[in-house]
Structures are given as structure tokens and as C-alpha cells.
């Protein structure tokens, strides 16, 4: 209970809220594809990534695996950009609305991946978000995966393995 309501920087935990929005709106469409937009490449350059390159085609599911196994910023931003038709501010607004619907009271979301220092949350809010995510079979499956093999893509001649950064696995 001590400090459980204290607002702290959300950092990479922001991706869980992006994941919640994706699963809420698109859980039955995870095999749909999108092309990684060039527009987000500068924003995520030299940050946590899964080497998902602009112009390559991915399924939503592949992006979710990249987000959860490698904390991949380009996956979160690419999905947000694509699913919002380039309206990242609108996506963030939807994140904040869903967050409040889940019951969070101390969280503020300002981007889809956590690079912006304005993303804040509390321990209680993260518990609520994770409890919400547990409703989705895709989250349970993806979050428990120690590895994911990304298929060959337009700029990757061979498949490659993403090793989870989750030390609990």
C-alpha cells in the first residue's frame, strides 16, 4: 500500500496501455497487416526495438509480440500511427479514455510507447491495466512467450528470433 498511488514515470510500461487499446478495438483482427510507417522512424531511432523497419509489412500480432518480448518502441508507435490513420494525438486521447474506463485515477498517457516523459502511472493503475489485459487470450499467450520468431520480411531475408526481456520467463 505504501506509495501505491504515487505517480511515477511510466516509461516502457506505457506499451501496456497501447496494448490494451489495440486488444480492446482489434482483438479479432490480429492477423490484419500494416506497413511500418516511415513517419515514426525518427521518433524511435536508437531506442528499444525489434528491428522492424519502415516499409516492411507486419501483422498486428507480430507487432504485439515485438512490444512485449523486446519492448519495441517502433512496434507500439507503428501500430498507433496506422490504427489512428496518422492521428497520434487522437490515439493518445483514446488511451486516456480507456485508461479511465478501466478505473485508473493517477495515469496520464502522452505517447504510445513511453518515450515521452509525460507518461505517468501508479502501481495501483498498472495493476488495474494488467488485470484488464488478462481478459484477452492473446495477451496471456503473448506475455508468456519466452521467444517469438519474426518471419522473413521485405528487408529481412531470413526469419529472426526475438528473445523476451522478461526475466521471469
Regions found by a protein language model. Give the residues of each.
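Domain-terminus/edge residues, biased toward the C-terminal soluble/receptor-binding domains
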Residues: 100, 104-105, 114-169
Amino acid at each position: 500500500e505504501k506509495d501505491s498511488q504515487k505517480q511515477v514515470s511510466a516509461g516502457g510500461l506505457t506499451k501496456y496501455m497501447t496494448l490494451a487499446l489495440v486488444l480492446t478495438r482489434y482483438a479479432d483482427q490480429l492477423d490484419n497487416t500494416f506497413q511500418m510507417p516511415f513517419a515514426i522512424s525518427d521518433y524511435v531511432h536508437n531506442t528499444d526495438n525489434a528491428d522492424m523497419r519502415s516499409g516492411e509489412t507486419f501483422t498486428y500480432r507480430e507487432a504485439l509480440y515485438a512490444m512485449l518480448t523486446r519492448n519495441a518502441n517502433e512496434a507500439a508507435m507503428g501500430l498507433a500511427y496506422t490504427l489512428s490513420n496518422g492521428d497520434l494525438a487522437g490515439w493518445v486521447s483514446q488511451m486516456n479514455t480507456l485508461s479511465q474506463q478501466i478505473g485508473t485515477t493517477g495515469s496520464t498517457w502522452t505517447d504510445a510507447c513511453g518515450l515521452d516523459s509525460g507518461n505517468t502511472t501508479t502501481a495501483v493503475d498498472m495493476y488495474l491495466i494488467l488485470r484488464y489485459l488478462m481478459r484477452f487470450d492473446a495477451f496471456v499467450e503473448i506475455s508468456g512467450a519466452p521467444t517469438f520468431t519474426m518471419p522473413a520480411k521485405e528487408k529481412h531475408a531470413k526469419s529472426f528470433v526475438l528473445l523476451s526481456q522478461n526475466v521471469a520467463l
